[in-house]
Regions:
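Glycine- and aromatic-enriched membrane alpha-helices
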Residues: 1-439
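Positively charged, small/polar-rich N-terminal and surface patches that mediate targeting and assembly
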Residues: 395-402, 413-561
Length: 561
């Protein structure tokens, strides 16, 4: 039976490695969704190369540095898997590789939209070759931190803290994106192009996290405990962020809530096996507060531009999660020796956790600062202003768009929106009293009427114009918005500049049909009393020329049967 269980958990080990690999897709979707469409292809490429370059680096020497024969508690050493196929534990190699790739890919989002691709590739190779393997050896490879009792079950410190700290250094050295801060330093929200994609990425990551945290479980009880704590912490963190943003901004912030879910997952990672459900509940509350605070701190005090919240999620909550082990570890059945300050363990474990953070942070900060500095002074770290404005898809990869053939507009069913708008608001006055019609005529006998309205109103306006005898019109998709005094919108805690919304421009030229009838028909079709019903513009037309016949004026508007 023992042999069977060993085989079962060995298979589980590799299945969970596949779960963690799938998290690369989650990171790619979160980062792509939280950034602008002109950089989506670049984001995907960076996440792909994180894993591919990381595999090469890990194969050459990274795995040996992590899991090789311990040397003085500082580094592992042994033959490279590249030349020692028979002597390599390939289950361990695969498992540790996907964890290494996770640490590397965290940085992509914080440095998004302005980093040279070649520079990012160099960074990715270095962190997978040397930086991550050495500090991970201290924690999991038999190094000096593990001998002191440092507890980081699945990587709050070894993976997320390292990735988040590297992201902070990289984003700081890069500087903010163009338009992120006003001249007086006020931060401006730059919304990502698809929260839908970002949310998909968040759910993929949450799903993968069950493998991320549960992969090293050695029995069913421990696995069940890990699944429970890995569920409770992010759920509570998300609720916490929702309440904070709802109270602070008047409405719950979707992007921040997605960050809150990831923050809770990061914070519980270190102690997922060592805390109980109450501890994970408290950790969830703390991580929700932490992610909101760090986002505010970066934007309003440090002026560091982090497009996706990688620093707040991974650095801030990597620190928090590691410290919380020293506070809330309760000596579970599977980890009886791990007891935190609040469960009678005194300050010993807490002190070891703090020492581990200090050591890992110092190693990461020094090595990654040197790496980024050398890159900056050689190949350069940041693209030019022109390249940033055009977009990295075009300038770095020759890609016109990651969405070729798709219009990047909100495609919302018109009937649904009309039902919501028309049924939820009753105009205080009648149409003619609310918007009196007065058409001023000039000497011209031909007029052009331009109607700007929402796309979902097109069927109504077309039917209304057809009813008064207008069968010809020009319809164009345009973008625009009105500015309503006193309304302020926020994205991830920062005010958002004016955003353009998809509209339709309907143009008709009339000579026989009175302009007043056209205006009245349009008003009747569009009026709800809500902001955004649209606008009508009336112009005089000096002349009309039909190209096919040469007819001019009113004759050019007539069609022969």
């Amino acid at each position: 039976m023992e042999k069977i269980l060993t085989e079962v958990f060995g298979i589980w080990y590799l299945i969970r490695a596949a779960f963690v690999f799938f998290m690369q897709a989650g990171f790619a979707m979160v980062e792509a969704g939280f950034t602008r469409a002109k950089n989506a292809g670049n984001i995907i490429m960076k996440n792909l190369m994180d894993f591919c370059l990381g595999t090469v680096a890990f194969l050459i020497i990274g795995y040996s540095l992590l899991m090789g024969q311990d040397f003085a508690g500082l580094v592992g050493w042994g033959e490279s898997p590249l030349t020692d196929f028979a002597g390599t534990n390939w289950s361990s190699f695969t498992f540790n590789l996907v964890f290494c790739a996770t640490a590397a890919t965290i940085v992509s989002g914080a440095m998004a939209e302005r980093t040279k691709f070649i520079s990012y590739c160099i960074y990715s190779f270095v962190i997978s070759l040397i930086v991550y393997p050495i500090e991970a050896h201290w924690v999991w490879g038999g190094g000096w931190l593990s001998s002191l009792g440092f507890h980081d079950f699945a990587g709050s410190a070894a993976i997320h803290y390292v990735g988040g700290l590297t992201a902070l250094i990289g984003a700081w050295m890069l500087g903010p994106r163009i338009g992120k801060f006003d001249k007086d330093g006020t931060p401006r929200g730059i919304p990502g192009h698809s929260l839908t994609i970002g949310a998909l990425g968040c759910f993929i990551l949450w799903f993968g996290w069950y493998g991320f945290n549960g992969a090293a479980a050695t029995n069913g009880i421990q696995l069940a405990t890990i699944f429970a704590t890995t569920t409770v912490a992010p759920a509570v963190a998300t609720c916490t962020v929702m309440l904070i943003t709802w109270i602070k901004y008047g409405k719950p912030d979707v992007a921040m809530c997605l960050n809150g879910s990831l923050a809770g997952l990061v914070a519980i990672t270190a102690g997922c096996d060592a805390v109980n459900v109450f501890g994970s509940f408290v950790i969830g509350i703390l991580s929700g507060c932490m992610v909101c605070f760090i986002v505010w701190l970066l934007d309003y005090k440090l002026k560091v531009d982090d497009p996706v919240g990688a620093v707040a999620v991974h650095f801030g909550n990597g620190v928090l999660g590691t410290i919380c082990v020293g506070l809330f570890a309760c000596g579970t059945d599977t980890m009886p020796e791990a007891q935190g300050l609040f469960y009678g363990g005194g300050f010993h474990l807490l002190g070891v956790q703090l020492l581990g953070l200090l050591a890992i942070g110092a190693w990461t900060a020094v090595t990654m600062f040197i790496t980024f500095y050398i890159i900056k002074k050689t190949v350069g770290l940041r693209v030019s202003a022109h390249e940033e404005i055009v977009g990295l898809d075009k300038m770095e990869h020759g890609l016109e768009s990651a969405y070729a053939g798709f219009a990047l507009e909100a495609d919302v069913p018109g009937d649904y929106l009309e039902t919501i708008q028309d049924s939820s608001y009753t105009p205080s006055v009648e149409l003619d009293d609310a918007v009196p019609t007065k058409v001023i005529h000039s000497d011209g006998s031909i007029s052009k009427v331009v109607i700007i309205t929402k796309a979902e109103k097109f069927d109504k306006i077309k039917a209304a114009l057809n009813e008064i005898g207008i069968g010809g019109m020009t319809v164009t998709k345009v973008s625009g918005c009105g500015v309503q005094k006193g309304q302020t919108s926020y994205y991830r805690g920062a005010k958002v500049n004016m955003e353009l919304l998809p509209k339709l421009k309907v143009e008709v030229v009339v000579s026989e049909v009175p302009v007043a009838d056209v205006v009245k028909a349009a008003k009747k079709a569009l009026y709800t009393g809500n902001i955004g019903d649209g606008k009508i513009f009336v112009y005089d037309v000096a002349d009309v020329v039909r190209i096919s016949t040469g007819a001019r004026g009113k004759d050019a508007l007539k069609y022969e049967d």
